[in-house]
Amino acid sequence: MRRRLLGIFSLLVLALSVWNVSARAQTQPKNGSASAAQIVGVGPIQMTVADMDRSVDFYSRVLTFEKASDTEIAGENVEHLFGVFGARVRVVRMRLGDESIELVQFIAPSGRAIPADSRSNDLWFQHIAIIVSDMDRAYQVLRENRVEHASTGPQRLPDWNKNAAGIKAFYFKDRDGHPVEILQFPEDKGAAKWHKPSGRLFLGIDHTAIAVSNTESSLKFYRDVLGMRVAGESENFGTEQEHLNNVFGARLRITALRAAAGPGIEFLEYLTPRDGRPIPADERANDIVHRQTVLIALDVEAAAQNFSSNKTRFVSSGLVVNPIQRSGTRKAFIVRDPDGHAIEIAAE
């Protein structure tokens, strides 16, 4: 009898142990690291520019952004954050609605221009998507200001594509060649705030889109490590998509991700054609092609340790005191995602 009771007790202990391990496994992120990064917000989106005054004029006069701050920074923390020795940087934050961009000019040392033959399926492609209340009027404003087209012209995505039907979109380039999208949602799509009457033409930034080589690899980074959630997916193709991207035969897998606050991040994986070029291994923050997305983390020190142990490629020398003055972001570091897009992780 005693032997039988001991046997039953042993089985109970074993069962409880198995249940405990299983429960822990179910609550862990897929790679065991999401809690270390835990992104709670997205933005601003940064772009390196060659001539700050020219860029400020373009974004304020043409796209109605408002200047929020204008600072010049230099010193060891600047060098260590951007990974550029001898850096002296002017940073201008500009706001449109609830969202912001940061224009970054390297006064020293200057970098390389965006390749003149850049295409939308090259992996260095990244744009901000500005929501407009009237596509025809917005396009007319851009034409009056002689912007460089990236799309053939505004496109209305077809009704057969349920997830994108009725969306109007157009790609163009700013004065440095950075791609920008204007986008108008139909009534049944987009956040409620994009449909509130405001009397404004350019409303705010819905998302930043990045070209990726493999959606699953990017999801492991942004969803599983950073903790962002998938908010939507679609597969886009046809003449409208080809002329929007200005890439013949374009067929895209599109995945939208969100954090608790700020604009989304959208993956653009070209299923065809597959001839997009990778981000150059020697791309640096002072090159005009450089863009980076700022992500706000609950625990930036844990995030830095996690990325370091996972051998993620760092742009920064490590976690540094953030020289860019933002409310609450005292420390930060910059890393690269699986395709080489720069991501700044900053403290909440």
Where are these regions (language model features)?
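Bacterial N-terminal signal peptides
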Residues: 8-18
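A generic structural micro-feature
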Residues: 37, 84-86, 119-122, 200, ...
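Vicinal oxygen chelate
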Residues: 24-38, 40-51, 90-103, 107-108, 114-203, 210, ...
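Bacterial N-terminal signal peptides that target proteins for export
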Residues: 1-9
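Extended intrinsically disordered, low-complexity coil regions enriched in Ser, Thr, Gly, Ala
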Residues: 53, 57-73, 107-109, 118-124, ...
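Short, charged/polar, Gly/Pro-enriched secondary-structure boundary elements
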Residues: 111-112, 178, 275-276, 341
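Core segments of cupin and vicinal oxygen chelate
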Residues: 48-99, 144, 160-164, 211-264, ...
